[in-house]
Design a protein with these regions (language model features):
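Acidic and generally charged, gly/proline-rich low-complexity regions
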Residues: 1-146
Length: 146
C-alpha cells in the first residue's frame, strides 16, 4: 500500500470550521489497486465530490461518486464499460476511540487531525459493481434475466 499516494485523499478536519465544506477527489485504477481487490475490474476512473458538514459533535459526510470501470461479460466474455453514479453517506461521531458502529456510523478520535477517505471511495465503488455482469448488447434480450 502506497501511503504517500493515499495522502492526497486526506481531509484536514481539525482546521475546518463548523460549517459546510466541499471537496473533489479524482481517482483511478491506482486507488483501487491499493486495497488488493479480488474483484476483476480494470481501467477504473472517477470523481468523488464530498460534502462535509462539520459540527462540534460529528462530521456528516456525503460521497457523490461518478465513474466507470472496464468489466467482462459473464456470458459473452466481451469487455465493456460500466458507468457508475451514486451517493453514500457516513456520520463520523467524535469520541475517545475509533470504532465502527455500523456501515453508516463511525466513531473517530476527537484528536484526529486528518480524515483519509480513500478506503471509503474504494469500498463504495467496489460495492456498486454488479455481481451479474452482462454486456449492454445482451442485457435487454428477452431470454436474459436482469
Amino acid at each position: 500500500m502506497d501511503k504517500k499516494f493515499l495522502r492526497k485523499f486526506g481531509i484536514k478536519i481539525q482546521s475546518l470550521s463548523n460549517n459546510k465544506h466541499l471537496f473533489e477527489f479524482d481517482f483511478n485504477q491506482k486507488l483501487l489497486d491499493q486495497f488488493n481487490s479480488e474483484i476483476d475490474i480494470s481501467k477504473s476512473k472517477g470523481v468523488c465530490n464530498v460534502i462535509l458538514l462539520k459540527s462540534e459533535m460529528m462530521l456528516d459526510v456525503t460521497f457523490n461518486i461518478t465513474g466507470e470501470t472496464n468489466l467482462t461479460c459473464d456470458r459473452t466474455l466481451k469487455n465493456y464499460i460500466h458507468k457508475l453514479n451514486f451517493s453514500k453517506k457516513i456520520l463520523f461521531k467524535f469520541g475517545d476511540e475509533d470504532e465502527e458502529i455500523s456501515d453508516e456510523m463511525i466513531v473517530i478520535n476527537r484528536a484526529k487531525s486528518i480524515l483519509n477517505i480513500s478506503k471509503y471511495i474504494y469500498e463504495f465503488f467496489i460495492l456498486e459493481i454488479p455481481v451479474k455482469r452482462l454486456h449492454p448488447s445482451i442485457k435487454n434480450e428477452d431470454n436474459i434475466d436482469n
